[in-house]
């Protein structure tokens, strides 16, 4: 179904056209003064310049015809020529009823669905997830869900760091600890063990030990570099060992991301694009895109219009080996070959902006990415502690993600234990859901590009613009519906016209659901959904306090209210689903 705001705009545009004005001036927006009106059209002001008339004259020209539009309850002119609009309750109720009867709450499918790849996650194998992985994971997951809900084909790719020097470090450290393993015997020709010679806990101890040693011992660094080179040349034992590292790590990462309610369609990594690098480099050379600078193979990506220096894109190092930039470009090559996407969106730390600017420019200049392919960098800000610095443990180290999740779960658990109405056996699971909502909502309610402060007391609060408050509102509605069901009341399937200002306000808020989702998709802004559901929850709670739903004796009125709060619950839960948040049945 068409957006409510577009339907209203169409009527106003027709009136502009009827009166001899360009219809483009008839665009309607939601009123920024809801105390004065529901919607407004400011088109008379810009039209005044074109038609050499005062805005108030244009607005008055339109007024009689606007008052005759069947869906409008009231039209007034304010200030220099603002057109204030209130719609009829019957029109509003009809729109909301159509939402109520629709599987996707009235959202229109796109005429031409796109294929969109979202690159988020970015975890490294052999390392545990830490707080630095939080934002990419939950922002990317939300964008994936929003895009998919809107109707596009969306592919989420974790893009693991599973290649390069870190692998050589791990292999070298394993060799020092267990030199007897067959993976290190170049004369070994048998089958390698199916089971990895280490657990995830051992693996997570091996990498930091190897990294620390390599930084302080030149010989150890040389060993790691040699192991990396042999792995990348396909040494049989090292490849088998690398596969073990990958398998053990991915199993643990899936568990870690699962605890965040995050999943991926592709578990690809840097290693997956390696087979494309030689072909890609040959293509770049044959088409004269490359040159040499101080032994480096580069592509010049600077433009005359640049107001700051954009360094050349490095394809290969002096020894002919690849870099992160090479694998990122080869990954675009791979994705174009395999999926022919319309968009590739990268959800990464905003401090990587220059790197991706170089990658995107190179991909476009060399035609690896065609004109129709949109490459989008979505750089996110930092999660900081109360001191304004990147969030750390008390000891100053990087906190594991599972520890952060546990901290906020415990904070919620302590609050829920005070509620004697909750079965003690359910408190743990409810705490998990509410804690995760507190964490994810606290993050997603901020603009992606902004830094924010992780404030556990504020995030876990059951009041204000928080995840627990939204969940509590949903649980309140579920409780009402359970009580009504226990009465045996059978409601009709219709939402009637509103009986009060707050009920009308609730219908208006519900009618903005599709507009909000579409805006969030186009602008990559989950925070807009957070703003919307906080506003909707507040409006519902005012309606709840002012309306005696359960004790109402008039059938049609009670039925309408039951359907209205059911739709409110469905909209809230759908929005939470788009944010990757689950709602419990009780709190």
Swiss-Prot record:
User: Which InterPro entries did the record assign?
Assistant: Arg-tRNA-ligase, Arg-tRNA-synth_N, Arg-tRNA-synth_N_sf, ArgRS_core, DALR_anticod-bd, Rossmann-like_a/b/a_fold, tRNAsynth_Ia_anticodon-bd
Which top EC class is given? ligase
Q: Where is the signal peptide?
A: none
Q: What is this protein called?
A: Arginine--tRNA ligase
Extract the GO molecular function terms from the UniProt entry.
arginine-tRNA ligase activity; ATP binding
Q: What is its main location?
A: cytoplasm
GO cellular component terms, alphabetically, are: cytoplasm
Per the UniProt entry, the Enzyme Commission number(s) are 6.1.1.19
A Gene Ontology biological process term: arginyl-tRNA aminoacylation
Q: Which UniProt keywords apply?
A: Aminoacyl-tRNA synthetase, ATP-binding, Cytoplasm, Ligase, Nucleotide-binding, Protein biosynthesis
The chemistry this enzyme catalyses reads:
tRNA(Arg) + L-arginine + ATP = L-arginyl-tRNA(Arg) + AMP + diphosphate
Q: Where is this motif: 'HIGH' region?
A: 123-133
What the record says about family reads:
Belongs to the class-I aminoacyl-tRNA synthetase family.
Family annotation (Gene3D superfamilies):
Arginyl tRNA synthetase N-terminal domain, HUPs, Isoleucyl-tRNA Synthetase, Domain 1
Against NCBIfam families, the record matches this protein to: argS
Q: Partners and quaternary state?
A: Monomer.
Which domain of life does this protein belong to?
A: Bacteria
Q: Which Pfam families match?
A: Arg_tRNA_synt_N, DALR_1, tRNA-synt_1d
Keyword ATP-binding present in the record's keywords: the answer is yes
- Tell me the compartments it is located in: Cytoplasm
Q: Which residues form a coiled coil?
A: none
């Amino acid at each position: 179904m068409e957006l409510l705001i577009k339907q209203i705009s169409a009527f106003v545009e027709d009136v502009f056209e009827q009166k001899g004005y360009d219809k483009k001036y008839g665009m309607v927006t939601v009123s920024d003064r809801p105390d004065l009106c529901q919607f407004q059209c400011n088109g008379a002001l810009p039209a005044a310049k074109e038609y050499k008339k005062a805005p108030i004259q244009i607005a008055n020209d339109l007024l009689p015809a606007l008052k005759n539009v069947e869906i409008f309850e009231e039209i007034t002119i304010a200030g220099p020529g603002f057109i204030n609009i209130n719609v009829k309750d019957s029109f509003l109720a009809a729109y909301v009823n159509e939402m109520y009867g629709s599987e996707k709450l009235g959202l229109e499918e796109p005429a031409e669905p796109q294929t969109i790849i979202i690159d988020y996650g970015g975890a490294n194998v052999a390392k545990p997830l830490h707080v630095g992985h939080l934002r990419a994971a939950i922002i990317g997951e939300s964008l994936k869900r929003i895009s998919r809900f809107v109707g596009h084909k969306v592919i989420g790719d974790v893009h693991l760091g599973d290649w390069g020097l870190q692998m050589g470090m791990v292999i070298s450290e394993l060799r020092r600890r267990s030199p007897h393993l067959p993976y290190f015997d170049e004369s070994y020709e048998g089958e390698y063990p199916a089971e990895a010679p280490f657990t995830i806990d051992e693996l997570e101890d091996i990498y930091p030990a190897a990294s620390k040693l390599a930084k302080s011992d030149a010989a150890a660094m040389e060993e790691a570099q040699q192991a990396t080179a042999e792995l990348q040349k396909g040494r049989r034992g090292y490849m088998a060992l690398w596969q073990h590292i990958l398998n053990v790590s991915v199993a643990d990462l899936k568990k870690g991301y699962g605890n965040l309610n995050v999943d991926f369609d592709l578990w690809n990594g840097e290693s997956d694009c390696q087979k494309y690098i030689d072909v890609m480099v040959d293509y770049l050379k044959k088409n004269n895109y490359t040159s040499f600078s101080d032994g480096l193979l580069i592509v010049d990506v600077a433009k005359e219009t640049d107001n700051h220096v954009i360094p050349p894109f490095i394809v290969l190092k002096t020894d002919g080996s690849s870099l992160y930039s090479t694998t990122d470009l080869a990954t675009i090559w791979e994705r174009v070959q395999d999926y022919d996407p319309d968009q590739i969106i990268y959800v990464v730390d905003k401090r990587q902006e220059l790197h991706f600017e170089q990658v995107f420019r190179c991909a476009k200049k060399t035609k690896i990415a065609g004109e129709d392919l949109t490459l989008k960098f979505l750089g996110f800000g930092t999660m900081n502690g109360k001191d304004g610095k990147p969030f750390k443990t008390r000891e100053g180290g990087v906190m594991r993600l599972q520890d952060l999740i546990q901290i906020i779960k415990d904070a919620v658990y302590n609050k829920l234990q005070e509620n004697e109405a909750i079965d003690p056996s359910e408190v743990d699971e409810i705490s998990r859901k509410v804690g995760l909502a507190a964490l994810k909502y606290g993050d997603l309610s901020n603009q992606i590009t902004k830094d924010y402060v992780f404030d556990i007391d504020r995030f876990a609060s059951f009041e204000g613009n928080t995840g627990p408050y939204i969940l509590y509102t949903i649980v309140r509605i579920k409780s009402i519906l359970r009580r009504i069901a226990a009465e045996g009341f059978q409601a009709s399937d219709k939402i009637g016209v509103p009986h009060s200002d707050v009920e009308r306000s609730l219908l208006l808020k519900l009618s903005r659901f599709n507009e909000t989702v579409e805006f969030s998709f186009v602008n990559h802004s989950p925070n807009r959904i957070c703003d919307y559901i906080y506003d909707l929850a507040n409006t519902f709670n005012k309606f709840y306090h002012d309306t005696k739903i359960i004790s109402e004796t008039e059938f049609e009125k009670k039925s309408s209210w039951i359907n209205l709060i059911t739709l409110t619950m469905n909209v809230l839960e759908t929005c939470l689903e788009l944010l990757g948040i689950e709602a419990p049945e009780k709190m």
